[in-house]
């Protein structure tokens, strides 16, 4: 099933994943390559998602909907299955470059280290709901940052009218996530980029990594 190329940019909220995915897409398209962007667990832009994944995303992001970490894992897994079957796999089969803001590494960080779910169970469910190809991207890059830098970046967005389930968590939880992403990158020997740099510099480093992958 190799055909296309699957590239994932990971990192905590506020590290600039979506911006960098869009810049990479522009870079590849200028070079005549077909690109499919996806956003996990869904997106306001249906070209980057599916209706079912978006409905699951609404439940996931609903901060007033009480649920267990186990339910969060199942909701994310269901959204991934939908994205894999309807967006990612078809695009790869057509030879496209798939650029994703997040994949299951976010669940390893958020639900694994953040909410205490065993990582082996997360991996088992991800494999059950998706595919080996999904679990092994051609390139997976982690944008890392410290707590203070992340807070400053998010503050530039302005006040959130309706913070979601995870945006509303306290500083201790957010710091756990920052550390989780750095630890996962080390564990899986993944390239990292300091998200505290300028957008232009981050993009340049991403291009350099993707070129040699």
Please provide the spans of the model-predicted regions.
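ATP-dependent small-molecule kinase phosphotransfer cores
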Residues: 33-131
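Hydrophobic anchor at the beta1->P-loop junction of P-loop NTPases
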Residues: 9
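Conserved lysine of the Walker
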Residues: 17
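A glycine- and Lys/Arg-enriched "phosphate-lid" helix/loop adjacent to the NTP-binding pocket
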Residues: 106-179
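Hydrophobic positions on the alpha1 helix immediately C-terminal to the Walker A/P-loop
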Residues: 20
């Amino acid at each position: 099933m190799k055909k296309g190329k699957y590239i994932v940019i990971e990192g905590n909220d506020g590290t600039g994943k979506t911006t960098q995915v869009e810049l990479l897409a522009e870079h590849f398209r200028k070079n005549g390559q077909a690109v499919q962007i996806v956003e996990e667990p869904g997106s306001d832009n249906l070209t980057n998602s599916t209706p079912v994944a978006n409905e699951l995303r609404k439940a996931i992001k609903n901060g007033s909907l009480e649920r267990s970490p186990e339910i969060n894992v199942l909701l994310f897994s269901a959204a991934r299955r939908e994205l894999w079957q309807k967006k990612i796999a078809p695009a790869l089969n057509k030879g496209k470059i798939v650029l994703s803001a997040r994949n299951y590494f976010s669940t390893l960080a958020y639900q694994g280290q953040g909410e205490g779910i065993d990582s082996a169970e997360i991996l088992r469910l991800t494999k059950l709901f998706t595919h080996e190809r999904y679990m092994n991207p051609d390139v997976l890059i982690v944008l890392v940052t410290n707590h203070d830098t992340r807070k400053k970046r998010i503050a530039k967005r302005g006040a959130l009218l309706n913070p979601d389930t995870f945006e509303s968590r306290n500083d201790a939880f957010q710091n756990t996530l920052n550390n989780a992403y750095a630890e996962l990158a080390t564990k899986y020997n993944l390239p990292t980029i300091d998200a505290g740099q300028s957008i232009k510099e981050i993009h340049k480093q991403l291009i350099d990594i993707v070129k040699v992958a």
